[in-house]
Every structure is written in structure tokens, then in C-alpha cells.
Amino acid sequence: MINKIVKKLLSALTMMVAILSTFAIPQTVFGAETQYFPVASSRVGPSSAMGTGYYGAQIDYMNYVNMNGGVNGVMLTWQECETEYNAVKTVECYQRLFEKDGQRIVVFDTLATPGAYAVINRMAKDNVVLAQYGYGRTDGADGRVWPWVFNAASHYWSQIAVKLKFMAQIEGGVDKMKGKKIVHLHIDSAYGREPLPAMRKICSDWGVKLIEISIPPPGLEQQSQWLQIRREKPDWVTFWGAGSGMNSTAMTNAARINFPRDRMMYVTFGAAEEDMYPAGNAAIGTYAVANALPGADFPLVKKIKEQVYGAGKGNLADPKRLGSVYWNRGLGAAVMWIEGMRNAQKMHNKVGKAVTGAEFRDGYEALNMTEARLGEIGIKGMVAPFSISCANHEGAGKFAVMQWNGESFDQITGWEAPGDPAFIRGLVESSAAKFAKENNITPKKC
């Protein structure tokens, strides 16, 4: 009789544990503290290839960290909300994800410039870091005006400067750029227009004629724009597309008017395998830049494949995408989150404990991703080494140029900085100072 009662109690207890384990419980989960992270994904819509890869990697890395003891014993929890790469839905997701079971978010990553602009003014008030990994509002790189906004480890003005530097090298030098014609073909959104302040200034200084051509979202109808390009006969086209459909459509249209693909340079968010495959042979020769290089041979990627996917916990529907551009970029973003959290724990004497938004901000600003540290993590060579400071929230500002060979990307350059980094930094500071003045913000003293 007693044995039957004990068995029933054990059975009930087992069922209760199973039920409780499906919920994210704040601060302690059976004795372990937790840290809550939001996943503002974009798995639906034109940017689905990007979103599934990027956010899939973030979840994969958090699973990997948990499988290896958490962050100094603190286990990671998360909740996902679908933005569909839409600014209004991004705000809705921010509000929905803001707090879970009594724990507030410490970081937010929209992977969308329109979405970043939609929430950026809430960061300081809410004590949340806006992590713009290579996207978003560029003058957020001035930490004196935007202490809660980071562009680590690169932004669009550095990216366009690196592209123009590469074009000049192909042409034989900056002096050979005078009289050249460049079309900036872009989606008609804040994202598509973001590089223009720096691009206009550099082109003006070099004597380059810049032609700006916009494409209405979602960007699948481009015939009139490419007819204009055929009439203009530019020397180069910089393409700022959003979504694999728009990105591949541009290459097929370029082929239709016989515009050489090796005179096209794609933005980071059009520079992935999923953007190239749909265009077939029309994509061959296209240049692109990367702030995270593809490859499945990096030690951390191998460990995630072995431990997370080996245990059947991988987030990607197709494990073959491990090591792809978008997945590796999401991995780089998640690594920065966790490194920021580690720093915060050490800086605030909270090793083994969850951190607050203000503490996380301090830790994120203390990021120092040296080659040695990248090697310890297992991603040396995948991203450029960088460090963040109180005033400089960009870091590296470096990109690698790649070229599509029909099956994969060939790396053409190493990690390249703008030809004049001080010039780009000056533009950032000038823009941030203007914003501060217009909004009565007193810049932080660093």
C-alpha cells in the first residue's frame, strides 16, 4: 500500500517537473539563476532566409551555452516574436518581449534598420542595449550621444567607404575615380538610404557622379530601374536590397541588360548564399562585403554542430546551413551578447548571477574581442577583431570583400577599413552632435 502511494507521489512529482520545465522561470530554475533574452525574429516575409539563419544561430548558441553550464552558471532563457521585418510589428514585439516572468530584457536586436529607428528612442529610458550588428542608425556609433546604442562591430558608412575604396583599387587609384559614374540602387526605406550621407560626400570629394535610384518595397519589380541603369551606363552599381527575392531579381535584371556582375557590389544583407542561388548563373561574379565570413570549419561552429545538432536541439530546419553567411552573422551577434554578459558579471561583482540592463550596458561597452579571445571562443577569422569604448560604439569598422563563383563565395580581401577612418568618424560625430543639439541632449563625457 505504502509503495503504491510513493509511486503515485513520484509520478505526480515527475509530471510537475516536466510541466514546470516548459516555462521560463525568473532568477532561479531549480537552483540555477537565469538571464532572459528576446528574439525579435523575421522568419516570415521577404527576409525569411536572413531571419531563419540569423536568429536560428542565436538560439543555437544560447542552447550551446546552456549545454555547457551557462554563463558562469547562469542559464539563458529566451522568447521569440515575429516582426516580419516590419517596423510597426517590431515595436509590438519589443513591447511583448520586454518582460517575461518578472525579468526584463537587457538587449534588443531587430536586424532591421527601419525597426531600429522605430525603437531607438526608448533604449535609454528602458535601460536596454540596442545591438545594431552592422545595421541601423549609423551615428549611434557615437556613445557620447547614444550611450545605449551600439553598432558593434561595423556600420553602413564604414561599409560604403570600404566598397568605394575597393572600386578605386580596381580602377587604379582614387585619382582614377574622377568622372566615373556610380548608381546606388536601393530599396526605398531608411535602410536603403542609410549609406547616402557618407556616399554623397566621398563621391563629391572624388569627382564621382552619384545617381540614386530607389525601388519600392518589397523590391521584386525592378524593370524600370534597370532600364534607367542601361541608359545611364554607370561604371559601378552599389546594391542595397532587402530579402533574397529582391536581391536575386537584381542579378537577373543585370544579366538581362548585360550589365557586368563584377561591377556590382552587394550590401551585407544581400551577401549570402540564399541571395545568390535563386539567380543561378546570373549571380556569378557579383561582389559583396561581409562582416562575418561563411565557413563551417570554425571550431565553435563544429562544436555547435556536434553538441546542439547532435542532440537534436538545432534550430535550423536544414542543418546544411550551418556555417552559412547569415547563420555565422547571427552567431557573431550572440557571442557579443554573452561576452557582454560575462564582462558585466565581472565588472559588477555578479559572477554566477543575472545582470541588470545598466550592468549589461557596461559589459557590452567593455567588449574587447582580440584575436586571442576570438580564438578562445572558436571564431578567429570569422569576424574582425575589435573593441568598444565609451565614445566609439562601432569598433572595427572593417569588412571583407567576397565574390560569388556560382557555388560559394571566394574571399577577395582581408579585413579592410575605410580609406580614411577618421573622415568617417568625423561624419558620425557631426551627425550625432546635430541630433543632440536638436533634441537638447548633453553628450556624455568620456
Spans of features found by a protein language model:
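Bacterial N-terminal signal peptides that target proteins for export
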Residues: 2-16
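Extracellular/periplasmic Venus flytrap/periplasmic-binding protein
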Residues: 89, 139, 147-259, 264, ...
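Periplasmic-binding protein-like
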Residues: 97-112, 129-134, 181-186, 233-244, ...
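Extracellular/periplasmic periplasmic-binding protein-like sensory domains
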Residues: 253-334, 418-419
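Segments of small-molecule ligand-sensing domains
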Residues: 314-327, 338-414
